[in-house]
């Protein structure tokens, strides 16, 4: 039995906390929202994010950062990318011993263009850092929490951290593979959110399967081009952290990124769509980061560029589709 603190009380953090508790581990969740903490401790639910799920009664929650830090030596960082550096810095300020960090965020930091493991590494003093890893792949929280068969990848620069992650989470409904390509697994998880928003737009407009298939295929090509430029193994993008995550996020209404895109394709404004969803949509922030990163690295990413224009320059979605279709002739 291992003690684990889960930082973040969103849908995926909650679903994975439930996995860990059912695997026999002691789990403490930390969140800022006292109402959510009280609900979990009293009712064993988190209805804002997982409306119908009843959670393991052994999971406890707190809003006390010091208590959360002292509880365990392994931390599951289940926070939005934009909050990761701030919370990791707060944790670091209170640490007195080494901790292992496993994150499940899928984004790239605006401005620095850093992957999430790099953000954590920046924020945690070396004397307190026992290793950093990621758990990623095609894994909707809504399915994990009701024990639908799910398969993901664990990756780290330290093989011991990858193996630890595999051992902690794997059970009869959650299969975990290890993968040595941390860069590729993190980039696959982040970049697919861009394509998922675009895929939602295509569905919202009402285009058919041909367009959806083309978008995912050419989207994967963009992901691979940038990934290879940044040091990833291109083969990683044919695995769970790449095409696996891409498929599930581009084809399901469980996906916040797809849902946002669908609403935009239906004619809603971004502000209107986000107010209805009331959740963090990582693809917005990732699109902004990757648009500028691709220009810096001189990588051709036409779908990302088109989505950036829709999200940040108020170009109509149909105009962007037209521009994509009328690009210069090229070989595949």
From Swiss-Prot:
Tell me what reaction this enzyme catalyses: sn-glycerol 3-phosphate + NAD(+) = dihydroxyacetone phosphate + NADH + H(+); sn-glycerol 3-phosphate + NADP(+) = dihydroxyacetone phosphate + NADPH + H(+)
The UniProt record gives the binding positions of sn-glycerol 3-phosphate as 106, 137, 139, 192, 245, 255-257
Which residues take part in binding NADPH?
Answer: 11-12, 32, 106, 141, 256, 280, 282
Under which EC number(s) is this enzyme classified?
Answer: 1.1.1.94
Is Heme there in the keyword field?
A: no
Q: Identify the pathway.
A: Membrane lipid metabolism; glycerophospholipid metabolism
Q: What is its main location?
A: cytoplasm
Q: Name one GO biological process term.
A: phospholipid biosynthetic process
On the tree of life, the source organism's domain of life is: Bacteria
Q: Where in the cell is it found?
A: Cytoplasm
| GO molecular function annotations of the record | glycerol-3-phosphate dehydrogenase [NAD(P)+] activity; NAD binding
Q: Which PROSITE patterns match?
A: NAD_G3PDH (PS00957)
- Catalytic site positions: 192
Q: Which terms are listed as keywords in the entry?
A: Cytoplasm, Lipid biosynthesis, Lipid metabolism, NAD, NADP, Nucleotide-binding, Oxidoreductase, Phospholipid biosynthesis, Phospholipid metabolism
> Would the keyword Lipid biosynthesis be found if you checked this record's keyword annotation?
yes
**Entry's family note:** Belongs to the NAD-dependent glycerol-3-phosphate dehydrogenase family.
What NCBIfam families has UniProt attached to this entry?
PRK00094.1-2, PRK00094.1-3, PRK00094.1-4
Function description: Catalyzes the reduction of the glycolytic intermediate dihydroxyacetone phosphate (DHAP) to sn-glycerol 3-phosphate (G3P), the key precursor for phospholipid synthesis.
> What name is this protein filed under?
Glycerol-3-phosphate dehydrogenase [NAD(P)+]
The scientific name of the source species is Staphylococcus aureus (strain bovine RF122 / ET3-1)
């Amino acid at each position: 039995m291992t003690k684990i603190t889960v930082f973040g009380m969103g849908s995926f953090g909650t679903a994975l906390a439930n996995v860990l508790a059912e695997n026999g581990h002691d789990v403490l969740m930390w969140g800022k929202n006292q109402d959510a903490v009280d609900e979990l401790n009293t009712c064993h639910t988190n209805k804002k994010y997982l409306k119908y799920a009843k959670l393991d009664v052994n999971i406890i929650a707190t809003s006390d950062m010091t208590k959360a830090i002292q509880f365990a030596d392994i931390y599951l960082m289940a926070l939005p990318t934009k909050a990761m550096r701030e919370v990791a810095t707060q944790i670091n300020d209170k640490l007195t011993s080494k901790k292992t960090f496993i994150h499940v965020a899928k984004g790239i930091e605006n401005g620095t263009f850093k992957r999430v493991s790099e953000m954590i590494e920046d924020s945690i003093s070396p004397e307190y850092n026992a290793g950093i890893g990621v758990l990623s792949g095609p894994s909707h929280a809504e399915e994990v929490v009701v024990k639908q068969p799910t398969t993901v990848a664990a990756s780290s620069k330290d093989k011991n951290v990858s193996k630890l992650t595999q051992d902690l989470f794997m059970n009869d409904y959650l299969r975990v593979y290890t993968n040595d390509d941390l860069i590729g697994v993190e980039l696959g998880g982040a970049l697919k959110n861009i394509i998922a928003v675009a895929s939602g737009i295509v569905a919202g407009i009402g285009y058919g399967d041909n367009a959806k298939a083309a978008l995912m295929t050419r989207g994967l090509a963009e992901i691979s081009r940038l990934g290879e430029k940044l040091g990833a193994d291109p083969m990683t993008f044919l695995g769970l952290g790449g095409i696996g995550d891409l498929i599930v996020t581009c084809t399901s209404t469980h996906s916040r990124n797809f849902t946002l895109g669908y609403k935009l394709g239906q004619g809603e404004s971004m502000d209107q769509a986000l107010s209805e969803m009331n959740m963090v949509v990582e693809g917005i922030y990732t699109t902004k980061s990757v648009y500028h990163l691709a220009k810096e690295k001189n990588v051709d990413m036409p779908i990302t560029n088109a989505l950036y224009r829709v999200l940040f320059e108020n170009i109509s979605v149909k105009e962007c589709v037209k521009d994509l279709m009328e690009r210069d002739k090229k070989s595949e």
